């Protein structure tokens, strides 16, 4: 008799249908689902920027309904679960109600937290913006000051170099105009020009019919490269021009400029040799054609 009484107290009532015991939990679950759907829809509208005309009244009504629901949930007491087991079956209605209530409370708390994160108060956003702007302003001010100092130092150093180069140019111009310092041809330079002229005569007289005229010239240039170390070297004065001054001011090292100028001078010497070689060859060719036409 006692077991039957416990069963009737903790289980279902005899006059109520079987589905009416779970109606309260189902209602709470349905309310919770609707709230989540409404919250998600509102968040999407906020993100996308859509605002309905009656959005303010709806938000106020929704906040009031949320407060009422939370009060109801707090007022509801968790049903006690009997420890007795009737006919080997555990009492499940109390546990389901308890789980539903706890899940609902957690869901409302999570929803409130998400709302607070997604829609922060205007004062906090303004404070964050001001702090970010201040930090960025400090960083930009420091970087601008450092950049201005570095740029000023670099400008002063280049200005000093430009003044030195200007003095060198001014000192070199009068000497060039007076003609006191004349460029002296070194012995190796004269030897190169004479050798190119003689080679052109020999090629026109003997080799032109059987060999290309460029092969002897290239062979002569290779021979000059080997004979260069046996001739006395003359000191070459490097002139300061506007181009070298501009290169120095642009930050290129002086060693690189000297090497490039040395390379260009060697290329100029080879080009001069080639011009002498071709001029002599063509002159000899024209003379031979003229003499051949006169002789019967």
UniProtKB/Swiss-Prot annotation:
Major localization class: endoplasmic reticulum
SS bond partners: 208-284
Topology, Lumenal side: 208-212, 289-296
Gene Ontology cellular component terms for the protein in this record: cytoplasm; endoplasmic reticulum; endoplasmic reticulum membrane; GET complex; membrane
Segments of skewed composition (Basic and acidic residues): 61-72
Locations listed in the record: Endoplasmic reticulum membrane
Entry keyword annotation includes Glycoprotein: no
GO MF annotation list: ubiquitin protein ligase binding
Recorded topology in the membrane: Multi-pass membrane protein
Key word Heme present: no
Tissue expression: Ubiquitous. Highest levels in brain, testis and ovary.
Cytoplasmic membrane side: 1-189, 232-269
InterPro entries: CAMLG
Any single Pfam family the record assigns to this protein: Get2_like
Residues with PTM Phosphoserine: 55
Keywords, sorted A to Z: Congenital disorder of glycosylation, Disulfide bond, Endoplasmic reticulum, ER-Golgi transport, Host-virus interaction, Membrane, Phosphoprotein, Transmembrane, Transmembrane helix, Transport
Gene Ontology BP annotations: B cell homeostasis; defense response; epidermal growth factor receptor signaling pathway; negative regulation of proteasomal ubiquitin-dependent protein catabolic process; negative regulation of protein ubiquitination; protein insertion into ER membrane; protein stabilization; receptor recycling
Membrane-spanning residues: 190-207, 213-231, 270-288
Assembly notes: Component of the Golgi to ER traffic (GET) complex, which is composed of GET1/WRB, CAMLG/GET2 and GET3/TRC40. Within the complex, GET1 and CAMLG form a heterotetramer which is stabilized by phosphatidylinositol binding and which binds to the GET3 homodimer. Interacts (via C-terminus) with GET1. Interacts (via N-terminus) with GET3. GET3 shows a higher affinity for CAMLG than for GET1. Interacts (via N-terminus) with TNFRSF13B/TACI (via C-terminus). (Microbial infection) Interacts with human herpes virus 8/HHV-8 protein K7; this interaction modulates intracellular calcium concentration.
Involvement in disease: Congenital disorder of glycosylation 2Z: A form of congenital disorder of glycosylation, a genetically heterogeneous group of multisystem disorders caused by a defect in glycoprotein biosynthesis and characterized by under-glycosylated serum glycoproteins. Congenital disorders of glycosylation result in a wide variety of clinical features, such as defects in the nervous system development, psychomotor retardation, dysmorphic features, hypotonia, coagulation disorders, and immunodeficiency.
Function noted in UniProt: Required for the post-translational delivery of tail-anchored (TA) proteins to the endoplasmic reticulum. Together with GET1/WRB, acts as a membrane receptor for soluble GET3/TRC40, which recognizes and selectively binds the transmembrane domain of TA proteins in the cytosol. Required for the stability of GET1. Stimulates calcium signaling in T cells through its involvement in elevation of intracellular calcium. Essential for the survival of peripheral follicular B cells.
Protein name: Guided entry of tail-anchored proteins factor CAMLG
Organism: Homo sapiens
Gene: CAMLG
